[in-house]
C-alpha cells in the first residue's frame, strides 16, 4: 500500500519533470537576444553610454566595415573611462572596447554556453555561418536556469561576502571611482546607518549618462530602492527566479536581518556551469 502523502508535501508531476528536462537541453538560439544594438569604433563613449542607457542594455557590438569585431560594455565605461579619469566625449569606443568577440554557435546547449562565458569572462556573440545572430548575457542564462540537481547548490557558497557600501549623500563621482577601482558592478547605499538601496552600473547608465546629468548628484537620489534581498540558504535556482522576476542582476543576501553577502547573475552562471 502506498504511503499517504504528508500534508504540505509536493511531488513533481510528469509534466513538471518533462518541462525541467526540456529546459536542461535548451539551445543558445532559444534564449539569445536577437536584436543586437551596434556601434562603431569612432563613436564617442558619451554617445555609446547614452545608447546603452536609453535602451537599458549593458553592451554594444562594435562593427567596422559591416563586420562585428568587438564589444563595449558598461564595465568598460566604468573601469576604463570614468574611473580612469578619461573624458566621455573625447574617448572613442575603439580606445576601450574588448576584442576579439567571444563567439559561440546557436545550437550549443545553454550549460555549455555558461561554461564558455565563465571561462572566457564575457558576453557571448552568437554566430551562424559567419553572420551575427544574437548575443547571450548572464541575465539571459539565469532566466532559463533549470530546476536541475546542479542548481540546488546554495547561494552562500558562491556569493561575495565582502560588501562595499556608501552613504546616501556620497557624490556619484566618488562611488563610481570606487566601483571602477574595485571592478565591481554595484554598491550598497546606506541611509542613517542602515542598508537602504543599491546603486548599479545600470543606474549609472539609465539615470545619469543617458540624460546627460552630472556625477555630482548624491548617490541616494538615483539608487534602486527599496532594496530587494533574499535569505541565506536559498538555492541558486531560487535566486535565479527572484532575479528574473524582479529584473535585477544583483541580489543582496540577508541572515537575521543583516546583510551577509551579495550574489550576482554571473555568480549564478558560474555555479550552474560546474
Residue ranges and their predicted role:
Residues 1-274:
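Tandem CBS (Cystathionine beta-synthase) repeat/Bateman regulatory domains
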